[in-house]
Amino acid sequence: MGEALRGLKRTIMCGESRENNIGQKVTVMGWVQRKRNLGGLIFVDLRDRTGIMQIVFGEEINKEAFEKSDNVKSEYCIAVTGEIVKRQSPNNDMETGAVELKGEDIKILSESETPPIYIKEGLDASENIRLKYRYLDLRRPDMQKIFMIRHKTCKVVRDFLDENGFLEMETPILTKSTPEGARDYLVPSRNYKGMFYALPQSPQIFKQLLMVSGYDKYFQITKCFRDEDLRANRQPEFTQIDMELSFVEEDDVIELNERLLAKVFKEVGGIDVKLPIERMPYKIAMEKYGSDKPDLRFGMEINDLTEAVKNSEFKVFKGAIEAGGSVRAIKAENCATMGRKQIDKLQDFVKTYKAKGLAWIAYKEDEIKSPIAKFLTEEEMKAILEKMDAKAGDLILIVADKNNVVFESLGALRLHIAKELDIINKNEFRFVWITEFPLLAYNEEEGRYQAEHHPFTAIMDEDIELLGTEPGKVRAKAYDIVLNGEELGGGSIRIHDSKFQEKMFSVLGFTKEKAWERFGFLLEAFKFGPPPHGGLAYGLDRMIMFLAGTENIKDVITFPKNQNAFCPLTEAPNVVDENQLEELGIKKIEKED
């Protein structure tokens, strides 16, 4: 059993001691990083979340403390009292390396078994072991730095929004299921057997109701839940920085959030954000980068060759154009010497994005090499090279197909090649607003339109009349903030008219009865003078990944789930007692083989 503190107080953190503390008598508490016994002296590196302090025990300093210190092992939790002195041999690799603590008294607060993972920076252990022993993984200095960054980010956000007149308000966690998009996590009700709450995918509807309530500027940093198939860097529960404002238009929300981003990235990460941030309509983003999340840290933009080859007899080009598609290409500079095997791999790569194939032209010093050259006239080849601004050494990669296939395949290929060539500047932070999103996307399987963002998004004023005739052409008052090819956040101006919201539900295939059954409380609220309003939400976890310099979302969440939405630490989800299920009116059905 460990020793009690008995009134002993920590007076300094391990990572805080400097030369100006020399001569002070202090008490430090933390975990033993390592111990070195040099015979007459014992050195202990003591660690807490601020850093490491070297402690020296010796018979001449204090015999009892010296003998007791010989019993400590790695990860023992101890308290040491003594005097800070100048080190005879400073360690310039440590922030506290100019000083050390002469250990005059030691308390062993608790012992530790040999840890299953080595607690150090740059740990090389399996993800499952790290998550199973997460409380040990979180002791590592690089993990503790991440969560100090997370804390500071939340503080800067709160301070900024408070200074700009926002109120931090909470919205319900147990709410109504309104299935549209990702699956809800459902919570059975004991009082209303056979009925369920849902955990919120976002506070969307409630924050709009707060605007109807007159709170004007709302924010919260809140948990959200989505029961979806997990992809890389997705978690079933995640954290949003959520906000909503009344009496605003798009420019107001964007300008405020540019100032917020500049403040957060400067104060937390030391990163300068150039304002104003570039804005790019969705249509341009897709045509130039094949993505609504373009990475602008490198070029290799998509070029439209349709006009250059519109009269071509090459069946692949001709067929795509006649079917209403297009012929587009990217240029990989200095890649004309790429071998056939490498190009074949690129062929296979674009086929995973439903492209039928990949045509290529290698512009070499002494020749133009291409398997499609024989199908093109000299004028067509010249027009392609001019359109691509090609020079000797360049490789042109062409896809001809339906526009959505062309954009998606070339957009993915652009990123793939940039990573392979290592031409992306990892120290650059390129923000861009993507605007004028399509309001709706047609679901061919269900035979109806679906909201591209959510069904509460307002329409561009000039597109309102298209809603009843050509809904696929309607643009939304929506905006996403993208950083280095990743969506950092997104938002929109909202519909604030009950009748127009009903019309939107109708376009989405809802009957009036179904719309009122699911969203009647919102439609009813909109009858009582709702203000124009809009907002935005950031993925806090994604933001911390950028600020902390990690590519793994699990690194920025204290107790994350694994790729199967399972917690190796607590073994959740787990089987519950039959009496709990009976109380909820739930009966398990055994799965048949």
Curated annotation (Swiss-Prot):
L-aspartate binds at residues 180, 226, 453, 494. PROSITE patterns: AA_TRNA_LIGASE_II (PS50862). It is found in: Cytoplasm. Gene3D superfamilies: Bira Bifunctional Protein, Domain 2 (3.30.930.10), GAD-like domain (3.30.1360.30), Nucleic acid-binding proteins (2.40.50.140). It catalyses: tRNA(Asp) + L-aspartate + ATP = L-aspartyl-tRNA(Asp) + AMP + diphosphate. Pfam families: GAD, tRNA-synt_2, tRNA_anti-codon. One of its GO terms (cellular component) is cytoplasm. It comes from the Bacteria. Disulfide bonds: none annotated. ATP binds at residues 226-228, 235, 487, 539-542. Residues 204-207 are annotated as: Aspartate. SUPFAM superfamilies: Class II aaRS and biotin synthetases, GAD domain-like, Nucleic acid-binding proteins. GO terms for molecular function: aspartate-tRNA ligase activity; ATP binding; catalytic activity, acting on a protein; nucleic acid binding; transferase activity. Its EC number is 6.1.1.12. Keywords: Aminoacyl-tRNA synthetase, ATP-binding, Cytoplasm, Ligase, Nucleotide-binding, Protein biosynthesis. One of its GO terms (biological process) is aspartyl-tRNA aminoacylation. NCBIfam families: aspS_bact (TIGR00459), PRK00476.1 (NF001750). Belongs to the class-II aminoacyl-tRNA synthetase family. Type 1 subfamily. Catalyzes the attachment of L-aspartate to tRNA(Asp) in a two-step reaction: L-aspartate is first activated by ATP to form Asp-AMP and then transferred to the acceptor end of tRNA(Asp). HAMAP family: Asp_tRNA_synth_type1 (MF_00044). Homodimer. PANTHER family: ASPARTATE--TRNA LIGASE, MITOCHONDRIAL, ASPARTYL/LYSYL-TRNA SYNTHETASE. This is Aspartate--tRNA ligase. It comes from Clostridium botulinum (strain Hall / ATCC 3502 / NCTC 13319 / Type A). The gene is aspS.
